[in-house]
């Protein structure tokens, strides 16, 4: 499909009217027709019909259908019309049983699917797709089988690999499937949602400059040069101003640093302030704003050293006043609501400094973003469970029902306000625990060396030099 056609249509679509442009599927949807070039017979009177609509799972999409009256050539294409997420997503699923093959998967056009055990990768494509894990593997088997008929010289090798893919469908041994999508719009279904899935791990990451460029979010060379000059100036100004002096006044002083916008790639300004939470510790509040695209975000980073033990904080919410308690959820903490069997794993929400009511509202909004709970294509049982959970959350937010909220933080950087401080709060329970080896490993503490690291570095350098000299000697022989 010609990029000219797409750009021409998008130029005519105003951003502020996006919600009106992308309507739910119905017979009343407006179809735009554009005269376009036929790549088959080179006629210039082909017709491209464009439909902007909303489809379950895919949110907003653009449907393109081309027909040439001269030669009869037809083609169709579907593209995502929704906005990119603020961060990319890396999804890992451990397939341990045949039932896992039925999980639905949304692969957007910028996503890469890989199976590490076979060193197999499905690269980004022009079109997004909605499928199951089994469907993705069967589609790969079909494509490789067809390729073996064309490339006869490597037929045996391709068919051997097809056999390996077919064996995966038996799930005789567990295997891992990974979806990496810099646009952040791909999903793998969690059938236990909103409960945590031990076999599913989702990590959000900040896109690189190359990934932003591939999404069309990059900046041109002139802007890059200007940013480099500005950053050099800011470095000279900031180097002396960022060092935080001692004293209470410094804790309230706001510091600014240049930072690249993860949404559009243009340099914006990140403001930071160091402050204290009574009866807890110092925290760093960071707020970023971009004058170019208007993107704004904020983040909380607790200060101080990593605690020796983890901590579980349990609050029994019994009144409207409890909903107003301050709560700090660090980016390493899990949020658990036992009454609904909800567990929001660390990394899902990031660091949040809000109230109990605010945190419950954020959890509800995150649930509403899950495409497998919405639309007429969703499973009826999942949809009913989702509606029940959101109804219960609304009751909690309105203060109509008591509930329990629990923060499980392996590095003790989370906090819930004690209304009776410095005395004990009868509704608040705090329990410290020893971290497991796996938790320390995930936090990078097992590999951390804080003693004699200079000597260890010298030993590693000497070992590397010895290995190089041995390789040279063996090559000379």
Curated annotation (Swiss-Prot):
Its main location: nucleus. GO terms for cellular component: cytoplasm; nucleus. Residues 447-457 have a biased composition (Polar residues). GO terms for biological process: protein folding. Gene3D superfamilies: ZPR1, A/B domain, ZPR1, zinc finger domain. Residues 222-236, 465-477 have a biased composition (Basic and acidic residues). It holds the Pfam family jr-ZPR1. GO terms for molecular function: protein folding chaperone; zinc ion binding. Keywords: Metal-binding, Nucleus, Repeat, Zinc, Zinc-finger. Residues 213-243, 442-477 are annotated as: Disordered. A zinc finger (C4-type) spans 38-71, 261-293. It is found in: Nucleus. NCBIfam families: ZPR1_znf (TIGR00310). Belongs to the ZPR1 family. This is Zinc finger protein ZPR1 homolog. It comes from Dictyostelium discoideum (Social amoeba). The lineage of its organism: Eukaryota, Amoebozoa, Evosea, Eumycetozoa, Dictyostelia.
């Amino acid at each position: 499909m010609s990029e000219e056609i797409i750009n021409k249509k998008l130029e005519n679509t105003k951003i502020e009217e996006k919600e009106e442009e992308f309507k739910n599927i119905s017979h009343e949807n407006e179809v735009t027709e554009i005269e376009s070039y036929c790549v088959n017979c080179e006629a210039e009177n082909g017709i491209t019909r464009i439909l902007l609509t909303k489809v379950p799972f895919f949110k907003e999409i653009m449907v393109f259908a081309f027909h040439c009256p001269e030669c009869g050539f037809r083609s169709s294409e579907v593209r995502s019309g929704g906005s990119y997420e603020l961060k990319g997503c890396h999804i890992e699923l451990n397939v341990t049983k045949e039932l896992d093959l039925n999980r639905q998967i949304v692969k957007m056009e910028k996503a890469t699917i890989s199976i590490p055990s076979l060193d197999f990768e499905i690269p980004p494509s022009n079109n997004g797709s909605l499928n199951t894990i089994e469907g993705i593997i069967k589609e790969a088997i079909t494509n490789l089988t067809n390729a073996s008929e064309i490339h006869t010289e490597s037929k045996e090798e391709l068919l051997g690999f097809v056999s390996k893919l077919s064996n995966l469908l038996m799930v005789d041994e567990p295997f891992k499937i990974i979806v990496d999508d810099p646009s952040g719009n791909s999903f793998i279904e969690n059938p236990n949602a909103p409960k945590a899935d031990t076999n599913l791990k989702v990590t959000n990451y900040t896109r690189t400059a190359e990934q932003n460029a591939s999404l069309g979010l990059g900046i041109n060379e002139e802007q890059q040069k200007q940013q480099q000059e500005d950053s050099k100036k800011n470095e000279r100004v900031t180097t002396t101003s960022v060092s935080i002096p001692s004293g209470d006044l410094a804790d309230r002083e706001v510091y600014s640093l240049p930072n690249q916008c993860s949404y559009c790639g243009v340099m914006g300004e990140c403001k930071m302030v160091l402050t204290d939470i009574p009866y807890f510790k110092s925290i760093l509040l960071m707020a970023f704003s971009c004058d170019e695209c208007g993107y704004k975000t904020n983040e909380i980073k607790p200060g101080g050293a990593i605690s020796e033990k983890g901590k579980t904080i349990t609050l029994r919410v019994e009144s409207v006043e409890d909903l107003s308690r301050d709560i700090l959820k660090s980016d390493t903490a899990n949020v658990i609501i036992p009454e609904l069997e909800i567990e929001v794993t660390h990394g899902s929400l990031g660091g949040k400094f809000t109230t109990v009511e605010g945190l419950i509202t954020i959890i509800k909004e995150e649930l509403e973003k899950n495409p497998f709970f919405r639309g007429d294509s969703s499973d009826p049982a999942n949809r009913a469970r989702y509606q029940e959970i959101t109804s219960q959350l609304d009751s909690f937010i309105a203060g109509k029902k008591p509930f329990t909220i629990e923060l499980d933080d392996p590095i003790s950087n989370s906090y819930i306000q004690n209304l009776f401080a410095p005395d004990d709060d009868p509704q608040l329970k705090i329990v410290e625990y020893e971290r497991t080896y796996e938790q320390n490993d995930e936090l990078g503490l097992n590999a951390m060396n804080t003693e004699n690291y200079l000597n260890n570095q010298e030993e590693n350098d000497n070992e590397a030099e010895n290995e190089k000299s041995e390789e040279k000697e063996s090559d000379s022989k």
